[in-house]
């Protein structure tokens, strides 16, 4: 207690008073002392932060630490998930990645154990052991110095007071002297020990810095091992990724998609084309009418994942067409490539048609192989779609307008308006002729089901769908679909099949019963007399349900040539003629029909041909007359008793319609008129009635109106792209058609030219390449004797007209026709199907044809069923009157 009291007293004197304070450390040792505090603080914080970096539990062995790592938990989760997705790409990826994460966790645990042992623990020893020991010695030295100063101060005080009281102080002074010497020795010992420890610490500073070098080396080694694990795992995962073909197709370069999937045609293109071939070829406004956004998004997602379950999209062809447009537009590079953009635009401005086709052919050959194959596939489909433009209204021009901007665009696009203004015109000028001449650009046949992955489903037996002869989907089966014409057509066939009467709904898509009557001419004019020695060529009568199908097969391949006539409206009518379905008569086979027309001879047929009678419309039949507008829709009345002999002028025995099989022209230009060759048989006297005219009779007669006839036409036949030459049968005689052959040879010529120097086809008739355009103007003024009649119709007899009372409606002005010398009185009278014959002494003639055979009179007694069927039709059409 006395020593402690002396220390406090001495410390107070040194702090407050003026007592001398002894400093035993040198300047170097004082500097080392100040650094110790800084080093201790640094080591303490470094240790604390390193421990925080550990992901495992601090202070445990490597195995236990590995189990506690977050990476280990992640690896276990991935491996467990991979067992639930064994056969999928995701399952394989999870399994491989889980193994890699487990290896990384093992490397990490070993790394942390090493860092903890080699770095963290030594830093902890520096901060918490070595430096504190030195600091303790420094404090001990400070206490010894205080003791030494206190003893020395007391000794000095005793030595001063010894002069006044010398006898009693010698013993006390000696004691203080000894105590002071002892304290000084202790100070020196402590000072030496402290200095040694400080110098040792400074000597070890290089070793302490090596800890951090070891830390970085340990981290580098850990990362190298981890990188080795990753480099070993990544190729395996990439292999799984490359082997898995189900990757998005939209927005992927065409070459990459084809290489990855191993396909020749891009999946979205082939899938959409196959779907449209099944259900979309008769959809009006295909590629032009937008689809629902949700439906389109769903279809694109289904195509992206390469799913084969696309049955639900059969009912919405507009969504399929929208997906095809979207795929073409989302390609990083257009199908017609950026590199050829300048060449395409330059070719578009060429005025000469032949040179333009040659340049287009050369540019097509420059396309990359993958682009060329897919472009050819798409163009072939679009050409097939354009063949049914009479139904879907998608002519080559319309298709080019809608799809062109999705096939070619500039590399650096501006705004949408600028792109549309700069590109659309050029693209349309390029795409339209390629579609029109698709068979010349790509003469080889294209199998649309390239991958053989699309199998058409069987049609239910209740869906009696039917096709016209040249329909684009005649080789596929119709599917039931809402808002589609296929179901409506099938229903109409079922409803009217009992009367052996088919209605071609394609001629007027939105026409009901009233419209169907309005689009047909009200009256059928009698025909000029013909020789009675000829027979109507006909075949066996088909069953009611298959009448359209047989007529399709019979007239589907009739070649359309330059001699085909396309009748326009008469001067007095404001509406174009509308085609109407045939009755039970089927169009004969093309070989027989064409050979008879081309040869100009009459081919006798069997007596069963008398059952092939049907009512037809004149070749230049005009639109509906005012009388038809007064008709009302009524149910068919039962057939009344028939009179024994109908009027001689009744044209009930006419054969199939001679109307052009082309649909009404959609072009703003009026169709041209082409005169027919004069008839070959005009020797029958006017007073002799035609034998076939006795086979049918109207239900009632009027004193001023002629019996109403319901004209019937064969189904409209869209022209084919590649027209074969017309071949005559061996028994047919006469030269081939002089007008059709040049046109056809002009189309066949390019197929024999060398590929590098193509010769463009002589410009074919517009009606051949585009059904919506009128016939070429050059045929309008051609020689009437060489003009070819319609190649897809049956010749029909000409009954003798019967004088009728004069009605109140005057006939319209008629263009002059070509007649024989014996019919010079009829040159100013034009045929009409919607006007009433006004002169009781005159006969209304029809545009003359090369062959107008007439049936034998003995066949009249064999066609009672045909008369009944035709009477039912007449009764239906004349109910309002």
Curated annotation (Swiss-Prot):
> What CDD domains does this protein's entry cite?
BAR_Rich1 (cd07618), RhoGAP_nadrin (cd04386)
Domain BAR: residue ranges: 14-246
Q: Which UniProt keywords apply?
A: Cell junction, Cytoplasm, GTPase activation, Membrane, Phosphoprotein, SH3-binding, Tight junction
Concerning InterPro entries, the annotation shows: AH/BAR_dom_sf (IPR027267), BAR_dom (IPR004148), RHG17/44/SH3BP1-like (IPR047165), Rho_GTPase_activation_prot (IPR008936), RhoGAP_dom (IPR000198)
**Record-level GO cellular component terms:** bicellular tight junction; cytosol; plasma membrane
Q: Where in the cell is it found?
A: Membrane; Cytoplasm; Cell junction, Tight junction
Chain intervals with Acidic residues compositional bias: 872-881
GO MF, one term, reads:
SH3 domain binding
Q: What SMART domains does this protein map onto?
A: BAR, RhoGAP
Topological type in the membrane: Peripheral membrane protein
| GO terms, biological process | negative regulation of small GTPase mediated signal transduction; regulation of actin cytoskeleton organization; regulation of Rac protein signal transduction; signal transduction
Start-end of Pro residues biased regions: 637-650, 665-678, 712-721, 752-764, 806-816
Name the residue ranges of motif: SH3-binding. 753-766
In the record, which positions carry Phosphothreonine? 679, 682, 753, 757, 759, 763
Residue numbers marked as site, Arginine finger: 288
UniProt feature, compositional bias: Polar residues: 459-475, 592-617, 822-844
Q: What does this protein do?
A: Rho GTPase-activating protein involved in the maintenance of tight junction by regulating the activity of CDC42, thereby playing a central role in apical polarity of epithelial cells. Specifically acts as a GTPase activator for the CDC42 GTPase by converting it to an inactive GDP-bound state. The complex formed with AMOT acts by regulating the uptake of polarity proteins at tight junctions, possibly by deciding whether tight junction transmembrane proteins are recycled back to the plasma membrane or sent elsewhere.
Q: What is known of its domains?
A: The BAR domain mediates the interaction with the coiled coil domain of AMOT, leading to its recruitment to tight junctions.
PANTHER family for the chain: 3BP-1 RELATED RHOGAP, RHO GTPASE-ACTIVATING PROTEIN 17
Put simply, this protein is called: Rho GTPase-activating protein 17
Q: Which organism is it from?
A: Homo sapiens
